[in-house]
Structure formats: structure tokens, C-alpha cells
Amino acid sequence: MILEVRKFQVKNKAVYIGTLSEDKIFGIIFSIDEPEVIRHRIPTLINFLEKRLNKKLEIKEGNSGFSDVVFKTLIGKISNEEAAEFIEVSYLTKFERKLYIYLVENVKRGEVITYGELAKILNTSSRAVGAAVKRNPYPIIVPCHRVIGRKNPYLYTPKPEYKKFLLEVEGWTS
């Protein structure tokens, strides 16, 4: 599996985007103005993928071009639907796949949806939605940052300010 980490500039901020990929993207990590966050989150993503794929991954650093896909999605050069063609979904649960597809196809740039609204649409609990959103391995492409709490729109892993930044880049303000 190839690990690619690139630095981009968005709204006077350094955005670090990392992808783990083969023919498609298996996972994405990002940070804003904090390259050490990427280094810290890489092992967590690898561990998640190894558990889901039930195998030890051999990671090599290289250039896959997939960080560019994530960046272009972030700045609106390509849609989430177009970018989603590049992600590997075979290891997702049926529920995760359903939720992530819904987000990609229905919650567009500049829009948000609450956990409760999404739960109602998917006929499940807000807690189930929250858990699946939190473990989303494809942030930015699968726009989990567009799912907000009714009382606090900026709850987010890894950091609330990341969610605020992503939503502002997309033109949404609370």
C-alpha cells in the first residue's frame, strides 16, 4: 500500500493531506497547519485498515496522485461524487456504505445535515450515525464534516476547528 502525504495551501493555511492507497484510496488523513497530526494519525489509520482487511499491511511512501484528488474535492474543483469513484469501499459495513453514499450523493458543498435528520432518513439512531461518521476513513471525499450537532455544529474528530475550517472553505457558516 502506498502512503502519500502532500502539503497544500487553502485560505492562507497549510493543509496536509495523506492517503493510503493501492488502485483506489483505502484511507485519508489530513491536518491544518499541524504536520505532526498527520504523523500521529497514520498508525491509527493503518491499524483500522489492518483490522478491517484482516491482514498486515506493507506500507511504502510514494506518489499515488490521490492526495490531489482529495485537495481538488476540498476546494471544489471536483465533486464529492466524482471523487468517490476513487475510494475502495469493499471493507465497509453495509450501514457505513449506505450512510457514506447518502452523504456523498445528497449533502452538497455548502449544505449541512444534523445527526438526527440523517438518522431519520436512514431509519437508525443518531448514535449509530455519530459512530459511523466518527470512523469515516475518507474525510473530505465522504463529507462527514457536513453532519452537525443541533446544539454544537463543530464537534469533530480530530479537532473542532478542522470542521469549522472545512465548512468555511465550502461556504457554510453557522
UniProtKB/Swiss-Prot annotation:
Active-site residue list: C144
Protein name, UniProt field: Methylated-DNA--protein-cysteine methyltransferase
Source species of the chain: Pyrococcus furiosus (strain ATCC 43587 / DSM 3638 / JCM 8422 / Vc1)
GO cellular component: cytoplasm
A GO term for molecular function: methylated-DNA-[protein]-cysteine S-methyltransferase activity
Keywords: Cytoplasm, DNA damage, DNA repair, Methyltransferase, Transferase
CDD domains per the UniProt record, alphabetical: ATase
Record's signal peptide: none
EC number per UniProt: 2.1.1.63
PANTHER family named in the record: METHYLATED-DNA--PROTEIN-CYSTEINE METHYLTRANSFERASE
Role: Involved in the cellular defense against the biological effects of O6-methylguanine (O6-MeG) and O4-methylthymine (O4-MeT) in DNA. Repairs the methylated nucleobase in DNA by stoichiometrically transferring the methyl group to a cysteine residue in the enzyme. This is a suicide reaction: the enzyme is irreversibly inactivated.
The keyword Cytoplasm belongs to this UniProt entry's keyword annotation: yes
Family that this chain belongs to: Belongs to the MGMT family.
Catalytic reactions of this protein: a 6-O-methyl-2'-deoxyguanosine in DNA + L-cysteinyl-[protein] = S-methyl-L-cysteinyl-[protein] + a 2'-deoxyguanosine in DNA; a 4-O-methyl-thymidine in DNA + L-cysteinyl-[protein] = a thymidine in DNA + S-methyl-L-cysteinyl-[protein]
Lineage summary: Archaea, Methanobacteriati, Methanobacteriota, Thermococci, Thermococcales
Record-level GO BP terms: DNA alkylation repair; methylation
Note: This enzyme catalyzes only one turnover and therefore is not strictly catalytic. According to one definition, an enzyme is a biocatalyst that acts repeatedly and over many reaction cycles.
Top enzyme category: transferase
Localization per Swiss-Prot or TrEMBL: Cytoplasm
